Amino acid sequence: MKEYWTSLASLLGVLAFCQSLMNSVFPPELRFAISKLFNKFFKLFSTFCYFDITEIDGVNTNELYNAVQLYLSSSVSIAGNRLSLTRAVNSSSVTFGLSNNDSIVDTFNSVTVVWEHIVTQRQTQTFAWRPMPEEKRGFTLRIKKKDKNLILDSYLDYIMEKANEIRRLNQDRLLYTNSRGGSLDSRGLPWESVPFKHPSTFDTLAMDPVKKQQIMEDLKDFAECQSFYERTGRAWKRGYLLYGPPGTGKSSMIAAMANYLRYDIYDLELTEVKSNSELRKLLMKTSSKSIIVIEDIDCSINLTNRNKKQSTGSYNEPEMLTGSGLGDDLGDGNTITLSGLLNFTDGLWSCCGSERIFVFTTNHIEKLDPALLRSGRMDMHIHMSYCTFSSVKILLRNYLGFEEGDLNDVVLKELAEVVDRAEITPADVSEALIKNRRDKERAVRELLVDLRSRVERNEKNGKSRVQNVSLEEQENRAFDSLYAEENGGEEEEIEDNICKSSDDCS
């Protein structure tokens, strides 16, 4: 054993002497050339190729590095031995990551690859316009040469898609509102945000189940059909108009849409917008996968002069009143035009962003300009009506835990008879049930009493839904009359609640 250690020490001494001799005899340029030659020789016979993905590319952040980091976080939680744990701002879950200089094996299309997380110390900077992190981070991807052309491009595309999905699932949705008077927030953005945690879903929405299913299918088709919009040359956007009496669930519908698609919401307050250019800047700062909401649009727009000639013979441009609201003098504030909004919903500016939904709400559809309602701007008109028997059953299930079989047939029959004639909103039914939610039987009894009293009052005032046309028909009839008046009395048929106008303001 002693002879072994003696021989090893002698060998190390000889190697050290040879190295010092080479350093003194051979110049650095020659040594570098020899080292480069050996590396080429090694690569020639190596069966692997390597790809480095650094955290910072020059002075810019490498998007691919962040995508790889997110993608591997879904695998290392199971396969890794030493992990790093992080939780980003606005994130709802903890993210797993590879520790420094650790590696993990991944498989894609039956091809095995190896990822290694490389962390090294960066050289000290004497001066730099942009300070760099002290550590230099990156991933190294090792793939067999025979598999490189087979999977590399598709594998990286898959990583980007997977990372976007993980980011969307982990990040809490946000509710944005435009800053007052066009001011900027601390990050220089015109939108202020808070976490969006509204519990409304399509399951809890008091609405006809058939209509809900149609809306859900339409939303799903929109989110999954990017190729359709590209093929047909249309901007990837969709518009929904929610109309009906107050308290019928228009805001809950918007929240259910956002929760169903996992989109952010931008609540655009038009009274804080001063001009068309400011409106354009606001809308350009919205992100994809978002819902842009303008509530009570009939209260923000002056449409009384639309297509009516002044004494000079010219047409008035409809204006959105901003600043202090509709009740103030127009001379005291700035105005934006209806065309400024329409140009962004389906004009040239509609392509500045993708996968966005515009939602307008109103209590009086007959007050809206036909140009705002035509197809291509508001693609789907959704009437939020008074409670029906099916929506009352949903509310009984939500607030009292009642299923249809829990109520006796007499109560169900009476509910079915009076609810349509009562003209009661889901908000009123919800309030009646919340007050007595600890006593379910009493809650149902008081709801029936309230429904009967409303029926008697409506019949006394001649407003019974049985004797008169429905609210939805009244809205369409009012809009039809407005349309006919603007076209010299010509009558046009309005089908499927989609209003068509021959006057194109865009």
Swiss-Prot record:
Keywords: ATP-binding, Hydrolase, Magnesium, Nucleotide-binding, Signal. One of its GO terms (biological process) is response to stress. Residues 497-506 have a biased composition (Basic and acidic residues). Its cofactor is Mg(2+). The keyword Nucleotide-binding applies. Residues 1-20 form the signal peptide. Its EC number is 3.6.1.-. This is AAA-ATPase At4g25835. It comes from Arabidopsis thaliana.
